[in-house]
Amino acid sequence: MASNWDLFGTTRWFRNIAQYDRSSAASAWGPAFHQRNETWTENQSYQLGSRYHDERYLSELRGAFSKQDAYDYPDTSGRDQSADRFYTRQYTLNWVNSVKLDESWTLGGGADWQRDMLDDSSRSSGVAFPSEAYERDNTGLYALAQFGNQVWQAELSGRSDDNEQFGRHNTWQTGAGWRFVEDYRLSARYGTGFRAPSFNDLYYPGSGNPDLKPEESKSHELMLDGQTAGVEWRLTGYRNDFEQMIQWAPDSQGMWTPQNVGKARIEGVELEGEFETGWLSHRVSAEYKDPKDKATDKQLQLISRKGAKWVSQAQWQQFDGSLSWIYQGERYGDAANTTQLGGYSVWNLAVGYQVAPSWKVSGKISNLLDKEYQTSVGYPADERAYYVTVDYAL
């Protein structure tokens, strides 16, 4: 194709099989029982897109399709006998545009469309889902204006979503920056957000919650960034307020499902840095935050106060690789803050080889040291996992 045109595509596939303890103590809902369940999930996704770009204009059109088949069943039976089966399909279209008016001004805008579908052969405990669960469309329109010179930067954007299930929601963001000294800048941002529950949140067998409401948010950020002694760094203070925040929590029967936790606030500070040591490039970050349920004044469950990350990357001829370390501090496994989960750190390794200009083969090992830890009470994290990816671009 012409040098101003790009055509690209990706395809991905994965299958996951896991076991968990579905036992329950005696309660008002029934006697105690002991049962180990197995989940089987297969996901496929495909994306195709085209991009045009020149010195002033960029336009990109992307289309994607994904499908997921999921089963939940006692490990004494098989997948074919599963009373919980969940077949979802998702179609998306996205059109993005930007035009550079002059050295200072850039305008952008676009549209996107998403259709979520639940196959009518899906079942939860052997029961079909309500007809309103089978299909949902969301159409979004957005626009952006940016200004920037050597001293000042500013941005204003707006978005309108028309969700077939939850109605229309309008959100916007604005920000400004001041480069008060060469290599140092002070910035501030404010924005509103809207997130509809996914089909998995609403209807996934054994854990979906069809009563979920959309999540709405307001975010405030104050940033100072600069470059000192060869290190590019950024210090950010933020406050995020949520209405009907969606979070995993136990229901009245002790089963973990997505829940609206009401009003929540997360305040924090994050320090990020980028630097090089010889042929290695590094990205590091450290964060401290206070995630709070405003109704109870308790720490939000499953969200830690402390976190850190380090990623080191290298490239040599057709080879590239990265080694990363992720740390999450202690957090609570319940809304009452009575059960504490320990902190953990995980290493990941990735390598890639550019076979040809259009072909690349990559491999990744997650949880390299096979660390044992829990993501929530009674749910151990994945063991060491291996991934292979083949990318092709025209």
Regions from the language model: what does each represent?
Residues 3-7, 44, 55-61, 103-107, ...:
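Outer-envelope beta-barrel architecture signal
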Residues 223-225, 274, 382-394:
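Outer-membrane beta-barrel "beta-signal"
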Residues 27-28, 32-49, 134-136, 165, ...:
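Outer-membrane beta-barrel signature, preferentially recognizing the C-terminal barrel domain
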Residues 4-55, 59, 63-90:
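Flexible loop and strand-edge segments within Gram-negative outer membrane beta-barrel domains
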Residues 13-17, 54-56, 65-69, 113-119, ...:
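Transmembrane beta-strands of outer-membrane beta-barrel pores
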Residues 9-11, 61-63, 107-111, 156, ...:
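Membrane-embedded beta-strand positions of outer-membrane beta-barrel proteins
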Residues 103-107, 148-154, 239-241, 259-336, ...:
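Gram-negative outer-membrane beta-barrel transporters
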Residues 38-45, 65-155, 162, 336-338:
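Outer-membrane beta-barrel transmembrane domain signature of Gram-negative proteins
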